[in-house]
């Protein structure tokens, strides 16, 4: 009679998410694949632009026998959405974004032409996420945090049990997201960081949309854009 309880305890402590990062496209964007022991996976911000990058992502998922269950964008600037269509068509998954990113997504191909990076945009079903939503991957839960400022509908994904945050372009190591772009607002971004991210434990590992990982505590103490 105690076996189900024991199994639940073991699953809670041992069924950990693995975070795999790829650096893709000319903007050096971080694409994330989060997966558990049951081989279920979430693809976040697939920035794979070139064919060899798409092949690299597919080979990793295939070789590790993963089954993508979710396709999520933290925001829809072009460098984070290049691979949306590829992932959706390969694994038959709809795109999940905040509703305020829909116009940003629709505008992405125009940005691509401006930067000489043309691409085929995602045109399938969209599932809208909001603050407080939970994305489940087996026993694991990722909490959706609404953190606008860099983009109007920017979200972050927080895993409380393992204390990590997929931060997109909100917070970087010793830096913050740009706000000198359409939909950006510096004061809103600073407020998002202070009120949504800096309330998390100092030990939380931050996986950003570009560059190396950091921690909440390190950025509180050292980020020059957030001093004072």
Model-derived segments and their meaning:
Residues 14-64, 156-167:
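Conserved beta-strand hairpin/beta-sheet module of binuclear metal-dependent hydrolase folds
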Residues 42, 72, 95, 166, ...:
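Residue-level marker for buried hydrophobic side chains located in beta-strands
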Residues 34, 74, 147:
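Conserved S/T- and glycine-rich ATP-binding loop of Class I adenylate-forming
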Residues 4-10:
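Short, low-complexity, charge-dense intrinsically disordered segments
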Residues 48-49, 111, 140-228:
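Metallo-beta-lactamase
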Residues 22-24, 124-127, 146-148:
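Short Gly/Pro-enriched turn/cap motifs at secondary-structure boundaries
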Residues 48-136, 221-225:
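Active-site HxH/HxHxD metal-binding segment of metal-dependent hydrolases
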